[in-house]
Amino acid sequence: MLFAGAPAHTACKRQTNTKYTTVYHDFCLWKIVCGYVMIGTSIKTDKTKRGREHIMRESGILMPVSSLPGPYGIGCFGKAALEFVDFLAEAGQTIWQILPLSPTGYGDSPYQSCSAFAGNPYFVDLETLEKEGLLTAADLKAESWGKDPLEVDYGTLYVSRFAVLRKAYAAWRSRCAGLHGCTYYYPDDYYAFTLANEDWLEDYALYMALKVANKMKNWVEWNAPYRRRDKAALAAFAAANEEEIGFWKFVQYKFSVQWQAVKAYANEKGVQILGGIPIYVSADSVDAWVGGKLFELDADGRFARVAGCPPDYFSADGQLWGNPLYDWAYHKKTGYAWWVRRVRHALGIYDLLRIDHFRGFDTYWAIPATSTTARTGKWENGPGMELFDALEAALGKLPIIAEDLGELFPSVRKLLADSTFPGMKVLQFAFGGGDNEYLLSLIHISEPTRRSYI
């Protein structure tokens, strides 16, 4: 359960100043699935007589799209998504928090994705494709969707989902074929989508086609011409694999159309979408493949250092995540252009944006890529406020929420304060630490800008 804004009040009361009236309401209890969540009336902002914006309390629920009910192995952008929006609106909730909508790869985590820009093909609603005449009921019944309807079987899903999506693509491509199948006439909104997203879509579709051709191996294991992005080799591959490349564009097109419909429905109901992005990209990703100078590279063009966390009382060896580290000096030279693109794209998908591992923008743990543990790492300085100033100059005021959990240096807390981004509180953390952690985690004494979780 997510609470945003001012702390809860124990009694319903009215506060009045010279111009404005603010009403606070108690939360009541609403039983959902297993256990209880707290539901209350949402009031967003008001003005005091001094003219300052006063952030009011609002609340919502964290529900990953993958956890929505459905008959085809995983939650998606279908009927259940709209019904969940209806539930939130009826319960007085104004925020639906979801996990990143990025494609999942090995490990099935949206925080280790093959693309920082693409959407998860698993979330495309198959029943919508059936209504569009791209699939039949027999197509859906022919596949296995897992034995347990309450759990996602990603191994089964990987086989069945893409098999069905390829059938839908074949039907769509056939529908778009011109006379004798020599020319394809795609819908106007498809052309608009590919044009609006060409800065990442072309590379992503080519990358995925190459992964399929290489039996889904990490790109660092591809033959040198493809690994090193030889222009002639890539052009020849693209010409020979036009249909496969088109499939990956088609899936992203359908993902975008369906998700934007869900988001528009939520916004009409007064519900904002709170999404998220990880700070780092995956080593096995199109971003790493095309990024080049965006990352710390050695003389051979391989990643010089990778991300992780230092040893602590949870792990004597620390955490070796393996994500490539950004070359922040290069990003600065470009005016943080890649980050501007990334955040602009994310804000086209979400209304509010949670950035994971916020502390990494202040200081981050850098580990030699050859290390087998995180012990050999060292702290390095991140871009700090320079990055957020560049983002705000390009995009305006940023609706960002910072994931600032865990032990933080004073400099991290200063960066959070300077950015004015809301941080996070988790009520459960109050019961596992010392007195200071207890006080920091209590949601009823939260600072007005905190987002609190129970």
How should these model regions be labeled?
Residues 56-292:
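Acidic/aromatic-lined carbohydrate-recognition and catalytic surfaces
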Residues 272-337, 342-345, 364-371, 375-379:
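Substrate-binding/active-site clefts of carbohydrate-active enzymes
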Residues 111-135, 288-313, 377-387, 421-433:
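Acidic, His- and aromatic-enriched active-site or binding-groove loops in soluble protein domains
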Residues 255-265, 335-421:
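Active-site neighborhood of glycoside hydrolase catalytic domains
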Residues 282-294, 407-426, 438:
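Substrate-binding cleft/loops of secretory-pathway carbohydrate-active enzymes
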Residues 441-454:
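Residue-level detector of conserved catalytic or cofactor/ligand-binding positions
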Residues 33-37, 44-55:
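Short, Lys/Arg-enriched N-terminal segments with co-localized hydrophobic residues
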